Swiss-Prot record:
Catalysed reactions listed for this entry: oxaloacetate + GTP = phosphoenolpyruvate + GDP + CO2
Record's cofactor remark: Binds 1 Mn(2+) ion per subunit.
SUPFAM superfamilies: PEP carboxykinase N-terminal domain, PEP carboxykinase-like
Protein name per its UniProtKB record: Phosphoenolpyruvate carboxykinase [GTP]
Originating species: Burkholderia mallei (strain ATCC 23344)
Gene Ontology BP, a term: response to starvation
Molecular function GO terms recorded: GTP binding; manganese ion binding; phosphoenolpyruvate carboxykinase (GTP) activity
Cleavable signal peptide: none
Matching Gene3D superfamilies: 3.90.228.20, Phosphoenolpyruvate Carboxykinase, domain 1 (3.40.449.10), Phosphoenolpyruvate Carboxykinase, domain 2 (2.170.8.10)
Amino acid sequence: MTRSNVVAATRTVPIDVPEYVKHRGLIDWVARIAELTEPDRVVWCDGSQQEYDRLCDAMVEQRTMVRLNPAKRPNSFLALSDPSDVARVEDRTFICSEHRDDAGPTNHWVAPAEMRATLNGLFRGAMRGRTLYVVPFSMGPLGSPIAHIGVELSDSPYVVVNMRIMTRMGRAVLDALGERGEYVPCVHSVGRPLAAGEQDVPWPCNPTKYIVHFPESREIWSFGSGYGGNALLGKKCFALRIASTMGRDEGWLAEHMLILGVTSPEGRKYHIAAAFPSACGKTNFAMLIPPKGFEGWRVTTIGDDIAWLKPGRDGRLYAINPEAGYFGVAPGTGEKTNPNALATLRENVIFTNVALTEDGDVWWEGLTDTPPARLTDWQGNAWTPEIGRETGRKAAHPNSRFTAPASQCPSIDDDWENPGGVPIDAFIFGGRRSTTVPLVTEARDWIEGVYMAATMGSETTAAAAGQQGIVRRDPFAMLPFCGYNMSDYFSHWLALGEKLAAAGATLPKIYCVNWFRKDADGRFAWPGFGENMRVLKWMLDRIDGRGEGVEHAFGVTPRYEDLHWAGLAFSPAQYAQVTSMNPDEWRAELALHAELFDKLSARLPDALAETKARIEKRLGG
């Protein structure tokens, strides 16, 4: 049984509300969007396997996806996007707060009334010839006090099937929402309406793209893209941009962080949250396998990308992974770099923009040392290693992705769906720096840790001989994802630390790491990957009050003898290469920090400028 229709501008659009939907506000909102966008029909997604299979079959028929060889990759698919729709579009991403200063200088801002007028024009009739899918989803385990619900209205079946993997999606969410529950409304269209009888294309999209957030009303509108974070609105749009503003208002944190558990041979368990910008090995670190010399240690994965953290009754910060799947970058993922990720991808995966092998499996750069002799590349063209060498063309797009259920990860933590979250013992912040920043530093206190995170960055270009690469500052790895003024975000971190300390809680320790120092020959000086466990163990020793280290201008760094070296031949001279600090380089670095602070000066917390002055004084000169 269904109920309710709405009369659109040109025809009646059946809303077809299932009897189990009791939320009048939700029904009315769906009706308003249907009236605006004029879809042929409305489908309320129940999240079932049958629904998923039906939509995947339809997309195979539509040539949006290819079914992979069931013997090689059971129940898995490859989607190839339009070449113009392959990544997040930061320059088309807007934070439309009521006041421009609330968005701040690091976000694109348009006045809300002006943006709403633009969106109304774009969305009017945008879903003609298509189906509007109502996608109810929970970010975090249903019923968790840390979780929040969203509803995405989308005309893309690709979005529906990916959201089923990436979130808890379906009827159970509507049941939890009840008659008056709160939800974040998300509207998405690929922006390509179909005329009567018009043949659809495999990957519909529009050259005009808008990814828009209204922080005060907690709304998300996305137009023109069917890809990734532009279209899966639970991910960066909700889980970071909107959730960060919710956290600011309500006293919690939404962070671009992995969460991992570490259990010692004695059974002591620790929980770490870590923020790294893109291309810095976040997923690899989340799924780390302890190296030789660490028998009896276990690292488990709670999340690989996003963390929501709320203060518990004991004053500690408790974190959940709000996602239910991994939307990971495929290139560079291989048996050497991340065997746990590869094992996660054995079945039930949607791959996007990777290459197709002759026997119906997938391949990407970094999966194997030697590419197959013949492939179909991400644009559907024949590809051979010779073509790659001659043209520089990659078989898989550099931002090609996999969407896989987190439950399939061999290293998944037993508490990954604990509704109460896990207590965080430490935060790690890291960037990709070939010089200057040492392997690991412990901040003296919360304020200096916030300073470290606020000034972190990664090199964006290959460094010329003897020169440092251009450093892109990415505070807290949140530059593209903070939904409000970055200076206010720093203040929020500082205030939360004060609040937790006032409640008598032991604050998480804060560390800065850099796995990417290079030697004189331009080679990475630290082996990285599983060997990062050696740094992690030192942090755990410090948490327990056991670890030693040497104090310097910025905090505490371990001496050679403070790390556990069993199973790795790494000399004191090699260690000096990754931990040395050049005062001249650091004076130049602090001058770059000043440039960042100048940009954010209007609301920059005094504590950060004071911390910078203290560090300069310690550094001398």
